[in-house]
Amino acid sequence: MRSEFFRHLRAGLAAIILAGTASQAGAAPAHGIAMYGAPALPPDFVSLPYANPDAPRGGAVVTGNVGGFDSLNPFILRGNPPWQLADLTHETLMGRSWDEPFTLYGLLAESVETDDDRRWVEFTLRPEARFSDGTPVTIEDVLWSYETLGTTGHPRYRGFWTKVDSIAQTGPRSLRLTFTEDDRELALLAGLRPILQKSQWEGRDITEAGIDDIPLGTGPYVVSDYEINRHVTLKRNPDYWGRDLPLRRGTNNFDEIRIEFYGDDTVLKEAFKAGLVSYVREFNAEAWATQYDFPAVARGEITLSEIPHGKPSGMTGFVMNTRRPPLDDWRVRDALITAFNFEYINDTLTGGRQPRITSYFSGSELGMDHGPATGRVRDLLTPLADTLPPGTLEGYSLPVGDGTARNRTALRRAVDLLNEAGWQVQNGRLVNAEGTPLSLTVLLQQDGLIAQASAMMDIYARALERLGITLKVEMTDKAQYAEREAQFDFDLTMMRRSLSLSPGNEQTYYWGADYADQPGSRNLMGMKSPAAEAMIRAMLTARDRAEFVAATRALDRVLMAGRYVIPIHQYSVGRIAHKSQLKYPDDRLPIYGDGIGFLPEVWWFEANE
């Protein structure tokens, strides 16, 4: 990107030019912006539809994380911060409503303006916006935050920055970004960059900051205490500037949020049963049905809440690293998927209670139709036919086992695929033409899913052993896992990729070729697919919802036929066991369910009578 000198030179010149062109093509400043259509909430909305504006404030909540932490800076690649920090302590120009596919309303910004093609976007800051130390948020803070995060921050911020042509101050409280390409989502993404305080980091390198260098934010909470790998305590800022904003009414109700760290999920759940933790999420339907009958539940001290949602299934499963042979061969990956006896595993571990994920966007209108591609989906994919994985156009579905432990038919099919790929069994071991045996290692993190994932791998390893394949399981703590995942140091690993009702630029970060070899990226499988790139481009340039849906369904086909992940269960409902004093608006749940912005944001504490 450009040097800071030239960026600020351009900012100054652009301010003069734009002042004279503000009346050119573009809508009037608005209170919100939607990816398609208009925002659902009017300019005078009182609160988010899933928040209780009359919720009482006070009390404390204790949540538990598995693993540890060695950083309190969630904006750089270095270190492992608690995942909750960014959303609770920092803010962006716009805030999201989680009851709409993708709509933003003013947070640090009081208004947003863009042109019909969305080649630029302009924000006007609220004059009352303040950092936690009481200093005002300035345009200089915003300009510095965008450039710093885009150039030296965590890789997740860099993709957006490469599409920014210019960023310029246009008035005392306003700035404009122009973009290098036709990508209608960029105007919304521009409103979702965290804003840091420039003066805190003057003369210092934010990427080299120690744990005591906690970034100042504008959010409702501040870090008040911590002990590395033990706990972090957040206190609600009594002088929080935005507490009366419509976007904030009925949210951030707890006086204190304490994050406790535990060695594994079993210890965390025992701490919950002992009353040391306020709530836990349960991802195993069998455990939910059979392990939550302890005395505190019977006494009414613990409530079991199920939170439905309307978002896509996303992808949860074991991702295969195609950077490493022989996982770069789709036939080997297909064989490994075929040998995974989901039906038997599901019945054994969950009592058959959790259906399997059938595609990345399954459970929503964005999910691919099964069978041959038709209509606009086929039109989008056909020009790329020579690059498509087998089954993309014809139709690909996950293999279905017979439900028995031996699963003979599926294993015979797996053998055929491995033979086609040049692997043969010799002396009980599957070897290639050079006589090298096939041995794989699955890397697992000691987190809330470790027990279930480990049990799955035990069953899977026995099936692969019958094929002559050795599968080893390696478990690491959070810090080790994060380092190895960032360097793609695994054959297989657990992947849980949540997907929204309005997928966009993040899809490039998940599946784009430019990120396949970039340390720390989310493209864990290392895929480099021209078809995936083209479908993402079609999504980003779609002018209407129908074209967007067709492009997303086409991308779904490319991802599934690529055979990159061994899918496991859907999580069609959130399961939360919590202290009965913790309440939420159960009559107005957001379409994204128990996701970002739900717990603890819209919950509150209500003392027992």
Language model features with spans:
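N-terminal lobe/hinge region of extracytoplasmic solute-binding protein
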Residues: 28-116, 124, 144-147, 216
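Detector for C-terminal structural segments
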Residues: 32, 65, 81, 88, ...
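Ligand/substrate-recognition segments at binding pockets and active sites
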Residues: 45, 281, 390-499, 573
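Gly/Pro-rich hinge or "lid" segments in bacterial periplasmic/extracellular proteins
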Residues: 90-102, 147, 191-258, 263-267, ...
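Aromatic-rich, solvent-exposed beta-strand/loop patch
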Residues: 108-110, 132, 137, 178-197, ...
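Ligand-site clamp/hinge motif
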Residues: 126, 209, 242-292, 334, ...
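Surface-exposed binding/hinge segments that line
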Residues: 158-202, 218-227, 372-384
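Extracellular/periplasmic solute-recognition and catalytic clefts
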Residues: 166-168, 224-235, 260-324, 331, ...
